[in-house]
Amino acid sequence: MTDPNGPKDIPEQSAEAAEPVVSKPYIMPDDPEPDAVELLAKEAAEARDKMLRTLAEMENLRKRTTREVADARIYGVTAFARDVLEIADNLQRALDAVPAEARANAEPGLKALIDGVELTERSLINALEKNGVKKFDPSGQKFDPNFQQAMYEVPDASVPAGTVVQVVQAGFMLGERVLRPALVGVSKGGAKAAPAAAANGESNSAA
C-alpha cells in the first residue's frame, strides 16, 4: 500500500530547458540601406534636373520655330520677288532706250507714256521694299564677290585695283541674303590696297 504522504516523483527536466538562453549579438550589414531623407533628396534633385532639361529643350524649340516662321515670312517671296525684278528691269530698259534729246522734245502723248513707265517702275521697286527687298549700288566700293558679279575690267589708275567703277545693273538684298548680285565693272591697273596687317607692320617699323 502506497503512502499518500510519501515523496512524489518529480519529472525530469529536458536538457534543452536546462540550457541557458543566450541572445545573439546584432551584426550591422556591410551595405546599409540609404537614409530615407537622402533618398528623397536624390530623387528630388533628379526630377529637378529633368525638368530643367525639358524647359531648356522647349525654349530651344520655341526659338527655332520663331526663327523658321520669320525666315518663311521673309524668304517665302524669293521667287516672286525675282519675277517682279525682271519686270522692273524691262521697264528700266525701255526708259534707257529713249534718248535724252527725244525726252526733252517729246510730244505730250509720248511724254505722258514715259512718265507712266517711270511711275510704274518706281511703284514696283517700292512694293519690293515693303516686302524686305532692298536695292544696293556698290559704286566706289571694293569688289566683293559675295554681293557683286564682275562683268569686265576697266583700266583706271586713279583708283585702287579691284574697285567697282561702273554698275551695269544694281543689286538687291532680301533680308540678309543676296536676291540678285550687282553686275559691275571693276578697275585694273591702279595700286592695290595694302593689307591691314602689312600696313600696321610698316607703321611700327617706321616708329
Curated annotation (Swiss-Prot):
It holds the Pfam family GrpE. It is found in: Cytoplasm. Keywords: Chaperone, Cytoplasm, Stress response. Disulfide bonds: none annotated. Transmembrane segments: none annotated. One of its GO terms (cellular component) is cytoplasm. GO terms for biological process: protein folding. Residues 1-33 are annotated as: Disordered. One of its GO terms (molecular function) is protein-folding chaperone binding. Its main location: cytoplasm. CDD domains: GrpE (cd00446). InterPro entries: GrpE, GrpE_coiled_coil, GrpE_head. Homodimer. PANTHER family: GRPE PROTEIN, GRPE PROTEIN HOMOLOG, MITOCHONDRIAL. Participates actively in the response to hyperosmotic and heat shock by preventing the aggregation of stress-denatured proteins, in association with DnaK and GrpE. It is the nucleotide exchange factor for DnaK and may function as a thermosensor. Unfolded proteins bind initially to DnaJ; upon interaction with the DnaJ-bound protein, DnaK hydrolyzes its bound ATP, resulting in the formation of a stable complex. GrpE releases ADP from DnaK; ATP binding to DnaK triggers the release of the substrate protein, thus completing the reaction cycle. Belongs to the GrpE family. This is Protein GrpE.
